[in-house]
């Protein structure tokens, strides 16, 4: 797959994730996205979160500008926090075919309650 978003000032937010070849599958890669926003599916109120992605590559690395643009597509979407962790996990697994991947969403407190949800994928041996 060609990288079309990195270095492209015209790149638009969409749900496509770009990857690149990575030879060292023993690496453990962590990505923190600290400026995520979406909306409550019931009230429409904005929610802010940090999203952490931990993965062991299965031959592909995640290009981070495409991830940034992917995450921007949720800005106006109403979604439950628990569903978000699984949706992002499934999309990343489809793009990367990793050995292991965990997505953790840590939402800021609203009404005095903070929520964190994790969703993990492990490749079958």
Curated annotation (Swiss-Prot):
E.C. number(s) listed in UniProt: 1.7.1.13
Enzyme active site: 40, 47
Keywords: Cytoplasm, NADP, Oxidoreductase, Queuosine biosynthesis
Reactions listed under catalytic activity: 7-aminomethyl-7-carbaguanine + 2 NADP(+) = 7-cyano-7-deazaguanine + 2 NADPH + 3 H(+)
Entry GO terms, CC: cytoplasm
Protein's UniProt keywords contain Oxidoreductase: yes
Segments crossing the lipid bilayer: none
Annotated residues for binding of substrate: 62-64, 81-82
Organism superkingdom: Bacteria
Pathway(s) of this molecule: tRNA modification; tRNA-queuosine biosynthesis
Principal location: cytoplasm
Localization: Cytoplasm
GO MF entries: preQ1 synthase activity
Transport is among the record's keywords: no
InterPro entries cross-referenced by the UniProt entry: GTP-CH-I_C/QueF, NADPH_dep_7-cyano-7-deazaG_red, QueF, QueF_type1
Family annotation (SUPFAM superfamilies): Tetrahydrobiopterin biosynthesis enzymes-like
GO BP terms in the entry: queuosine biosynthetic process; tRNA modification
Function: Catalyzes the NADPH-dependent reduction of 7-cyano-7-deazaguanine (preQ0) to 7-aminomethyl-7-deazaguanine (preQ1).
Family: Belongs to the GTP cyclohydrolase I family. QueF type 1 subfamily.
Protein's name according to its UniProt entry: NADPH-dependent 7-cyano-7-deazaguanine reductase
């Amino acid at each position: 797959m060609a990288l079309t978003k990195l270095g492209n000032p015209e790149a638009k937010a969409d749900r496509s994730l770009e990857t690149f070849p990575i030879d060292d599958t023993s690496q453990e890669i962590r990505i923190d996205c600290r400026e995520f926003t979406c909306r409550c599916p019931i009230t429409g109120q904005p929610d802010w979160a940090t999203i952490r992605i931990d993965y062991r590559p299965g031959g592909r690395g995640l290009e981070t500008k495409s991830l940034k643009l992917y995450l921007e597509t949720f800005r106006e979407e109403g979604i439950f926090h628990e569903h978000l962790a699984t949706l992002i996990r499934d999309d990343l697994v489809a793009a990367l075919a990793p050995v292991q991947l965990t997505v953790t969403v840590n939402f800021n407190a609203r009404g005095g309650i903070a929520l964190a949800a994790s969703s993990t994928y492990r490749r079958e041996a």
